[in-house]
Amino acid sequence: ATHAVQSTYGYEYQGDNLLLARVNLLLTYAEHLQARWQRKPTKEELQPIATIISWNLWQMDGLRLSVPGGKPQPETEQLDLFSMFGAAEPQPPTVSCKVKNWRKGSHGTAQNFETIQEGSTSMKFDYVIGNPPYQISDGGASVSATPIYNRFIEAIKTTHPGAICLIIPAKWYSGGKGLDKFREEMLGDRHISTLVDYSNSLDVFPNVDVAGGVCYFVWKEAYNGKCKYTNYRNGKATTVYRDLNEFQTFIRYPVASEIVKKVKEDGEL
């Protein structure tokens, strides 16, 4: 379990989100110990794990690869003739972020995060899990908004992670502005081992109504085969193993797809 924590890295800009991530990772370690040995961890066991987590989950501006140096904007003040052309406030110096390689030395060896980005050390994402932004509004009705979750998925795949698990709108099955190529690639991707579909988004997000429902998928680099597809509709789950692109148009409901398949086999379609 300690090695698993040592191998888990991540950064976050917002301090409150960082705190939540650290707490959740520490709780995961404690829950594992409870499940494995049927006891709670001691303070002596938690202290080194907390130290590892404080190093491995850090606060960083991902665009600058540095410690966030911003501060809240001051309240608007009335300008006067003598202050409006004053000297610009100097920017704080950039502070590099450091991470530790816990496999080197008894207490790990620290190195600048930039050196990892520059390729001096190979960096690979084992798992990518999340809920990416869904769309960008173009000022019109929501139906005309431009999806952007597809861009996140395409970018993530270029990093060749071991596995991806993302929850996104299900509208891409048959619609969505500018999603034709994305739809074709997703339906033909045999690395998608699992696709779980919720016809009603309220089953997942009680306070958010996403038109067309939502879905989450599991993409595995080492997998190549049929997809385990589950559809939730009116509280009932139906699961089948299928090729997502078996029909020219994706059929969402397994019962309907079986009917179409049967009709095609009988030569009546």
Annotate each language-model stretch with its function.
Residues 1-195, 200-204, 209-216, 220-234:
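SAM-dependent methyltransferase catalytic region
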Residues 207-269:
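Flexible, glycine-/basic-rich loop-and-beta segments that form/coincide
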